[in-house]
Amino acid sequence: MAAPPAIPRRGLFIGGGWREPTLGRHIPVINPATEDTIGDIPAATAEDVELAVAAGGPVLARRREPWARASGATRAKYLNAIAAKITGKIAYLALLETVDSGKPKDEAVADMDDVAACFEYYAALAEALDGKQHAPISLPMEEFKTYVLKEPIGVVGLITPWNYPLLMATWKVAPALAAGCTAVLKPSELASLTCLELGAICEEIGLPSGVLNIITGLGPDAGAPIASHPHVDKIAFTGSTATGKTIMTAAAQMVKPVSLELGGKSPLVTFDDVADIDKAVEWPMLGCFFNGGQVCSATSRLLLHEKIAEPFLDRLVEWAKNIKISDPLEEGCRLGSVISKGQYEQIKKFISTARSEGATILHGGDRPKHLGKGFFIEPTINTGVSTSMQIWREEVFGPVICVKVFKTESEAVELANDTHYGLAGGVISDDLERCERIAKVIHSGIVWKNCSQPTLVQAPWGGNKRSGFGRELGEWGLENYLSVKQVTRYCKDELYGWYQRPSKL
């Protein structure tokens, strides 16, 4: 088993340096796999947010100062330097992420690879942005010439979740900096360690002071002041739908743009024409048990054609029994702990309610017997689920899947869309025409065909309905942080001629 890393004690990263929180408060860091306190993080408050926003403002000075005016190529050099540093620290950062969040070490390593790749991707887009400025617009008249400028929005507030701490932060930080914005990042208080290490990396590579500021703390104390701050020009948030509504309300008071990536209750529709059941079974496993099911896009509603339901569930249970559940630092661990005691108790309550409402727990539902401490939950499979049950309608955010059987394609589509959410969905079928039909009628921002959960930095990510709006990743992620300006000039030597010219005296 890998040795736990030393936990650095960091302050708030503001204006290119470290400072203690104004009120001197700290929040303990709990390793969810052992329940041990392993360190602490600063507890920022509104006073610290004020300092962080002020640090970002002068650097940007409302789009006139060096970071915003720097070429995309210049900003790309910094982003590539961050990527290189992350690549050199992958093993350490992965261990830090593991003890902070409870996710298996192998998953954390993959996350860090993706973090570096994301910075590299947006470095390339930053460089390409130079060539897209002054793009002419074809007009039907000759007397005007028009082009478009893409400018940084300004100071952006980035509020990120605990399930992929550094990766979800990078999805926002990398495009924001590529666009020329300055940023105040507020990661979840449940998993902030790697985000603070990002501050140390920015210091190492000489990122101009104030371009990225990182504050840690509780949502009401540190997140809310960012959302309501008059000098924060945009908010990008990933987290719960309830908090998303609060952020929208705060931003609306200043007509401030927001982008929201919120909850989900995604369906995975599986038809009876699959020739290889094990190949099909692997996708709901990845779709709901990877990262402990703590994934906003988790395909936690499994819809099975009645002809395949029994053999499919038999194999799903066998696969679930075969998952290695252990301390996430152990080699080969495939299911670690959930993030916290509160999350553990909430998931257990979901399972208990499902049982009391009439669902059958086909497998799991409890703490693994061989683990006496830590916030571990077995992969849990619920059958006999009705559409009125809480387990069908609400996001669990844990390794809990609910199963419903269908007879026809139209019934499957109706069940798939029976949700307030619209982040993702999937279809498993050997009939590719059927897959295409289903992809077109599932009401979500992402649809997977014969897979679940591939997340590609080049492709848009985001949802519909109560899963939020706006898109991250790909070129769409960069556009999130750019303001479009039309510039038009009159080209003729003569008067435009709308008004009658007065006679000369």
From Swiss-Prot:
Write down the chemical reaction(s) this protein catalyses: betaine aldehyde + NAD(+) + H2O = glycine betaine + NADH + 2 H(+)
The entry marks the following residues as binding NAD(+), namely: G239, S240, T241, A242, T243, G244
Q: Which GO terms describe its molecular function?
A: betaine-aldehyde dehydrogenase (NAD+) activity
Question: Where's the active site on this chain?
Answer: E261 (proton acceptor), C296 (nucleophile)
Key words of the record = NAD, Oxidoreductase, Peroxisome
What GO biological process term is on the record, naming one?
glycine betaine biosynthetic process from choline
Among Pfam families, the record links this protein to:
Aldedh
GO CC field: peroxisome
Its annotated compartments are: Peroxisome
**Group of enzyme by EC:** oxidoreductase
Q: Where is this site: Transition state stabilizer?
A: N163
Q: What's the superkingdom here?
A: Eukaryota
Q: Which InterPro entries match?
A: Ald_DH/histidinol_DH, Ald_DH_C, Ald_DH_CS_CYS, Ald_DH_CS_GLU, Ald_DH_N, Aldehyde_DH_dom
Listed CDD domains: ALDH_F10_BADH
Question: According to its UniProt record, which protein family does this protein belong to?
Answer: Belongs to the aldehyde dehydrogenase family.
Report the protein name in the record: Betaine aldehyde dehydrogenase
Q: Which organism is it from?
A: Hordeum vulgare
